[in-house]
Regions:
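A conserved ligand/cofactor-binding region detector
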Residues: 29-557
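Short, low-complexity, charge-dense intrinsically disordered segments
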Residues: 1-4, 8-9, 13-23, 32
Length: 557
């Protein structure tokens, strides 16, 4: 039986709620049965331990490092096969211990990581810029199975505490399924209206909208899932980064899990080349300044949150510092690259040559060649700093813009007893879904607090926090890298919160540097009237001609 769709173009606004209820009447039973498939009243948690696989690697990483070091002072290219035992002993220790670490960066290791928590990934693995990851998406992959990190039982996390922990995780998954079912009618109705779906629409078009509606529903429902939820990824790092990660395993909100995962990565490398670690004796730092400082002060999570939010003034992202002479410095830098005088190229002309996509083909590149283009490097000299507040799940994606680094909180030092979370717009527009969502938030914080009250370490208790947990951070980037980020994240396909933050940031840029901001917008805005295709998303086109009225066009989903 083919689903029936209605076009909202033919209904006055006051009928929308009635139409949503009508949609629910037709679709809820089928949707619920599909989305709740496999659900049980009290599901057990699949808590398989982290699994690390070394997928690709250098055969002789240590000898390659020594050969690279020798090449600096040799009359020919030194190969790993030419390295002697004496050189391994003398050159290896001399370069490593004196801080000449670039030679250990040539060797790279590609790992497969399974059954690791999203808390570990956010708090540690992706908290620095020197890596590459392809991670399983919660936005578009339905989380059917209850899979999450569960710490081993010990003196501070006994069986009764573990029961509270696992029940909270199982309950979160139930809320996830319930919200998925409650929201799909809303997402379907909005998408049907955007794409003008009617009874006579092409069945394949209708099927595509149905798939998209389900993805949009689970994208919002995932906000209730715990940060303990498992994820899977391919993760590639250099040899020196692996050394640094092992040294800093205590520097996160999940030190125990971190030690387990990074320790397994080190062990995998040692199996292929024991010298790469054994020669230097790198060991984890046990006492970090962050924890030492925290031990002498009282926790003030609520007070910190109130103070930070007051400074934001209701914004998602607020400009707190910037290069006041950005336009002139950029223009001077552009002229320096091309050897021009100010009489030959004025400030406004330099800015236009750099940022106008009709005059600078680099702006139309999807390969992001900015750092390789001599003239685009002029944008490196203007910097902007933002204070922002987004959810854990949004920040997990936002932090992937590694050239726009942020100072993110140690949640164990900024914990709040009261629920502190972000609510997506779609939930605010559905009273029933919002009620379920708020109950899920209360339950998550109650379980977390119950563990803390039992003496369970914050490291463990905070795994129960939901994806929606508010993250307050400070982020800085040069205009070069912010330009790339804003181009990608002002697209309607960008994650809702990151889109909102980016729009706030572009608005702030417009306030202080309007001569720069007029060139900023999503790919379609940049490309319209200059090249084709206007939209670079292909079959994932959002359905809205954003380029006709950016930044005034309204995003509905």
């Amino acid at each position: 039986m083919r689903p029936v769709f209605f076009s909202l173009r033919f209904f006055p606004p006051c009928w929308l709620c009635a139409l949503r209820d009508l949609c629910a009447k037709f679709f809820f039973v089928a949707t619920q049965s599909r989305m709740f498939e496999g659900a049980r009243p009290s599901e057990s948690v699949d808590s398989a331990p982290p699994r690390v696989t070394l997928r690709n690697f250098f055969n002789h990483p240590f000898d390659s490092a020594i050969a690279a070091a020798r090449t600096c002072y040799a009359d020919h290219l030194i190969t790993p096969e030419e390295v002697t035992d004496k050189q391994r002993l003398n050159i290896g220790a001399a370069t490593f211990n004196s801080g000449h670490h670039t030679v250990f960066q040539h060797a790279t290791f590609e790992f497969g990581l399974e059954n690791v928590s999203r808390q570990f990934v956010w708090s540690f693995l992706h908290a620095h810029p020197f890596y590459n990851s392809e991670q399983q998406s919660q936005r578009y992959v339905r989380m059917d199975r209850v899979q999450a990190y569960v710490p081993p039982v010990d003196l501070y996390f006994n069986e009764s505490a573990k029961e509270i922990f696992e029940q909270a995780i199982s309950r979160a998954w139930s809320y996830y399924r319930e919200l998925s079912a409650l929201l799909i009618n809303d997402t379907r109705a909005i998408l049907a209206d955007i794409w003008r779906i009617g009874p006579n629409s092409n069945p394949k078009h209708i099927q595509k909208i149905e798939r998209s509606a389900e993805k949009r529903a689970i994208e919002i429902a995932r906000y209730v899932l715990p940060v303990a939820a498992h994820t899977t990824m391919v993760h590639t790092i250099s040899g020196i980064v692996l050394h640094r990660l092992w040294r800093m395993v205590a520097a996160s909100d999940a030190p125990s899990e971190t030690r387990t995962v990074i320790g397994a990565m080190v062990a995998q490398v040692k199996e292929h080349d024991q010298q790469f670690f054994e020669r230097f004796g790198t060991e984890p730092l046990e006492e970090l300044p962050e924890w030492k400082a925290a031990s002498s002060i009282a926790f003030a999570g609520e007070a910190f949150a109130r103070e930070f939010d007051a400074k934001l003034g209701g914004k998602t992202s607020k400009l707190v510092d910037y290069s006041p002479n950005a336009a002139r410095v950029i223009a001077d830098s552009y002229r320096a690259v091309l050897g021009l005088t100010e009489s030959q190229c004025s400030n406004s002309d330099a800015i236009d040559r750099l940022l106008n996509p009709a005059k600078n083909l680099y702006r139309l590149e999807t390969l992001n060649v900015g750092v390789h283009a001599p003239q685009m490097r002029a944008l490196q000299h203007a910097n902007y700093t933002f204070a922002k507040k987004i959810s854990h799940t949004a920040d997990s994606q936002d932090q992937r813009h590694r050239m726009v680094p942020g100072s993110r909180p140690l949640l164990t030092l900024a914990d709040t007893r009261e629920p502190d979370y972000i609510t997506p717009q779609l939930l605010k527009e559905n009273p029933r879904a919002q009620e379920v969502y708020e109950r899920a938030m209360r339950d998550a914080w109650s379980a977390k607090n119950a563990l803390l009250d039992r003496g369970v370490p914050p490291e463990i208790a905070l795994y129960l926090l939901p994806n929606s947990k508010s993250i307050r951070l400070v982020e800085t980037g040069s205009l070069l890298h912010l330009l790339h980020k804003w181009t990608m994240r002002t697209c309607f396909n960008a994650q809702e919160e990151i889109y909102a933050a980016s729009m706030d940031e572009v608005g702030e840029l417009r306030r202080v540097h309007p001569e720069l901001a007029k060139y900023v917008g999503p790919p379609c805005h940049i490309r319209a009237g200059i090249t084709t295709p206007i939209c670079t998303e292909g079959s994932h086109f959002c359905g809205i001609k954003v380029w006709l009225d950016f930044p005034n066009v309204t995003r509905r989903i």
